[in-house]
């Protein structure tokens, strides 16, 4: 911790009269300590936020590695990654639900493999295949995703 030594007032600042005995009041040192303490707390909060964001970005990177993204030359945004993960999970859920309706594994495997081919899986729900007017999520899942606005 810094020592409480007067460093001289800035130009044009009002100078408090010295306390009895020719020394500055103890309140000045306490004020400097409070400022230093606040600065330390701010630095600690910044470090915590930096670690939190690094953890969040690491989690998104790991999710991007497991979510299929055929034909993508660029890294998916966080929003696109979440949309792809949702679409992928829903497709897998649908396959498992329909698998329960069929007796053996061989009966249903061929029915759904086309959903995981490049031509049937899009970068994000709502994207269209070339020459297709129906939304992918509507065709695959039977629902229309609600529009989502990004806060700026």
UniProtKB/Swiss-Prot annotation:
Q: Return the PANTHER family for the record.
A: BASIC HELIX-LOOP-HELIX PROTEIN NEUROGENIN-RELATED, TRANSCRIPTION FACTOR ATOH7
| Complexes and interactors | Forms a heterodimer with TCF3 isoform E47; interaction may be required for DNA-binding in certain situations.
Domain (bHLH) spans: 40-92
Instruction: Provide GO CC annotations from the record.
Output: axon; chromatin; cytosol; nucleoplasm; nucleus; perikaryon
The task this protein performs is described as: Transcription factor that binds to DNA at the consensus sequence 5'-CAG[GC]TG-3'. Dimerization with TCF3 isoform E47 may be required in certain situations. Binds to gene promoters and enhancer elements, and thereby regulates a transcriptional program of retinal ganglion cell (RGC) determinant genes. Although the exact mechanism is not certain, retinal transcription regulation by ATOH7 has a role in RGC determination and survival, photoreceptor population development, targeting of RGC axons to the optic nerve and development of the retino-hypothalamic tract.
Taxonomic lineage from the root: Eukaryota, Metazoa, Chordata, Craniata, Vertebrata
**Coiled-coil annotated residue ranges, if any:** none
Looking at the keywords, is Transcription regulation present?
A: yes
Q: What is its main location?
A: nucleus
A Pfam match: HLH
Sorted alphabetically, the keyword list is: Cell projection, Developmental protein, Differentiation, Disease variant, DNA-binding, Neurogenesis, Nucleus, Transcription, Transcription regulation
GO BP terms? axon development; circadian rhythm; entrainment of circadian clock by photoperiod; neural retina development; neuron fate commitment; optic nerve development; positive regulation of retinal ganglion cell axon guidance; positive regulation of transcription by RNA polymerase II
* Entry's disease: Persistent hyperplastic primary vitreous, autosomal recessive: A developmental eye malformation associated with microphthalmia, cataract, glaucoma, and congenital retinal non-attachment. It is due to failure of the primary vitreous to regress in utero, resulting in the presence of a retrolental fibrovascular membrane with persistence of the posterior portion of the tunica vasculosa lentis and hyaloid artery. Disease manifestations range from a trivial remnant of hyaloid vessels to a dense fibrovascular mass causing lens opacity and retinal detachment.
Q: Which SMART domains match?
A: HLH
Q: Which SUPFAM superfamilies match?
A: HLH, helix-loop-helix DNA-binding domain (SSF47459)
Identification of the protein by name:
Transcription factor ATOH7
Task: Show the GO MF annotations.
Answer: DNA-binding transcription factor activity, RNA polymerase II-specific; E-box binding; protein dimerization activity; sequence-specific double-stranded DNA binding; transcription cis-regulatory region binding
Gene3D superfamilies from the entry? Answer: Helix-loop-helix DNA-binding domain (4.10.280.10)
* Places the protein is found: Nucleus; Perikaryon; Cell projection, Axon
């Amino acid at each position: 911790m810094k020592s409480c030594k007067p460093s001289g007032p800035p130009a044009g600042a009002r100078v408090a009269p010295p306390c009895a005995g020719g020394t500055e009041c103890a309140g000045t040192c306490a004020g400097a300590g409070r400022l230093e303490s606040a600065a330390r707390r701010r630095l600690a909060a910044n470090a915590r936020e930096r670690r939190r964001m690094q953890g969040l970005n690491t989690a998104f990177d790991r999710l991007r590695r497991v979510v299929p993204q055929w034909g993508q030359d660029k890294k998916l945004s966080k929003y696109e990654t979440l949309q792809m993960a949702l679409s992928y999970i829903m497709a897998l859920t649908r396959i498992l639900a329909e698998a329960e309706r069929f007796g053996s594994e061989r009966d249903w495997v061929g029915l759904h493999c086309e959903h995981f081919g490049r031509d049937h899986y899009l970068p994000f729900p709502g994207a269209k295949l070339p020459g297709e007017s129906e939304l992918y999520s509507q065709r695959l899942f039977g629902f229309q995703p609600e529009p989502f606005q990004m806060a700026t």
